[in-house]
């Protein structure tokens, strides 16, 4: 079918380059990534440009840093570590060195699009055990709490899969 869409901006959940290609092919659009956090302002913290080699951080509003997740030591540009933001224009609920738990890399290399804003990579993982399933933050400890409350033994297995581009989470419990 023909549609008038030319561009799609996607965020809220990590997606792969394979998923980008599938979205672009199936919808006939150019797909761009956007990064945000509920704790900051939602979407709009960083955005992908036409070069699509990382996301430019909106440095008019945020100071990004990469730290060692274990020591809190600030790491140089190009090093992989935990992404931290300080908000500089948010007045009602400012954030100082907010630990996102997302593992990323920051780069000040010149972008072919001409922008000079620092770029962040797509998150490559997390520094905690949080899972993001269909846009919902899930901690294994939350699952364990529910299982124990319902009288199940603490022996369980969490299986995460992707079926037709939809995350699934199954919990297998050992019955006693």
Which ranges hold each PLM region?
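Active-site glycine/GP-rich loop and adjacent strand/helix microenvironment
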Residues: 1-176
């Amino acid at each position: 079918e023909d549609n008038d869409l030319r561009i799609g901006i996607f965020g809220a959940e990590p997606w792969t380059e394979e998923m980008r290609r599938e979205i672009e092919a199936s919808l006939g659009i150019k797909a761009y990534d956007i990064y945000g956090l509920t704790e900051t302002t939602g979407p709009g913290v960083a955005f992908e440009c036409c070069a699509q080699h990382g996301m430019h951080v909106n440095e008019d509003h945020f100071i990004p840093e990469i730290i060692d997740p274990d020591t809190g030591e600030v790491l140089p540009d190009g090093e992989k570590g935990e992404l931290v933001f300080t908000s500089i224009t948010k007045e009602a609920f400012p954030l100082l060195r907010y630990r996102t738990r997302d593992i990323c890399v920051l780069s000040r290399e010149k972008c072919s699009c001409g922008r000079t804003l620092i770029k962040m990579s797509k998150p490559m993982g997390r520094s905690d055990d949080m899972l993001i399933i269909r846009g919902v933050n899930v901690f294994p400890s939350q699952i364990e709490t529910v299982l124990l409350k319902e009288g199940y033994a603490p022996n369980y297995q969490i299986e995460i899969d992707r079926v037709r581009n939809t995350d699934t989470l199954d919990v297998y419990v050992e019955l006693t």
